[in-house]
Amino acid sequence: MWLKKAFEQAVDGGRILKSTFSDEAAIASFGVGKNMVASIRHWALACGVMRELEGEFRVGGLASEILRDGGLDPYAESASTAWLAHWQLAGRCFRSTTWYWLFNHVTAPTFTRQELEEPLARYARMLDPKHRLSASTISRDLETCLRSYAPRAAGGTPEDFAEPLLGELGLLQEVHKGQYAFRRGPKASLHDGVFTYALVDFWDQVAQGQSSLAFETVAYAEGSPGRVFKLDEESIAQRLIALSDFTRKKLEWTDSAGLRQVHRKPLS
């Protein structure tokens, strides 16, 4: 997959030279065209495979643990890798505004791409009033996003890195031609480790330093695991109850007098 191609460009210390994505000789090493190389760079940054630092790119620690030779998933074949990529795209608003907005702000039971275009344009203007996106850009981004989760019945374009990766997650379906709906409920392929990672990541973003987090926040807050993974209340509760054993009591669920919370001890 394309994320692996970006990772393979790393040299000593996890460094990736910026020229890797612009130099003609370097581009040849990817075996794809210039536009696709730009896409690889974009998605590698958006999915957290690498980050920009001091005039170069550096491979992220989690990406290295997953994609290195002998790593957790060196060929990016595991559903857990796909779930992590989804979390980076839809749980954070970094180079993935459309993904984040779709999973955190769209609440309609069904929707079409055309129905989403104007609300997304307003959201983008709110984030950056000085940067106006064309209608064609909004439409294209939405099409790419929707097709990465709900590929066409006849199969998608081979250039779209996300299509085979995220389509397996079962988060979005095309219920009628051009009409989509989220699939809410339990997600069998979502590993407890990925859910826990997302929970802690979300916690650090919205409530860093707090020792407890309300169930409603985990389930319904913007950027929460409940919203991003489209889990129902029962599924979230079951996962939170299992946290104590899974994390060796670093995270514990309590339900007392109707107050449902997750408690957190310092994580090493």
Give the residues covered by each predicted segment.
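Donor-sugar nucleotide-binding helix/loop cap in glycosyltransferases
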Residues: 1-268
